Amino acid sequence: SQQNIDIAIEMQEARDIPIKVAVLDDEGNETGEMVETGETVKGVAKENHYLLKMALYSELKMDLYVLPIVEKLAQNYPKKKYWTQLSALYGQEDRQLDQMGALEAAYDDRLLDKQREFTALSQLLFMFENPRKAAKVIEDGLNQGIVKAEEKTLKAAAQYWHSSKELERAKPYYKKAAKVSKEGELY
């Protein structure tokens, strides 16, 4: 029942020991199978146990408890989906520095594969006064073909290099941005 789930979760959180929850079938009847949802003696639960715990909290509309679980998933099972989900959750909590850190960890592990991820990371790096790394990230995305060579991304690369006082590295990006620009301001 809902009350038993709440009590089990509360007890597990209070003592930080493993708990077992009965598995229910589609009709809500117990199947006789038990699933451990807590952390093991070593301090790290199986990935599916964290996912089950996260699903329970989501189902109970206890979103406050989801973030620490995603943090553990990203730390113990460093997959792209956990790093990007963690970054998004930090963003929702207005924790931009942590948001940047999660995306940067995914980038360092070569997990990013979407333009929006490269641009988000480069913007956060620039915002936190690291224009050189911002330029390297956007340049890396451009070189890999993940980031499209369009005016706004080329202009961003140029501005990031310019801000890091690397004018020679900024020039080619300003030129490329000017070529694809519909306006003449970059010439």
Regions found by a protein language model. Give the residues of each.
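Alpha-solenoid helical repeat scaffolds
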Residues: 1-187
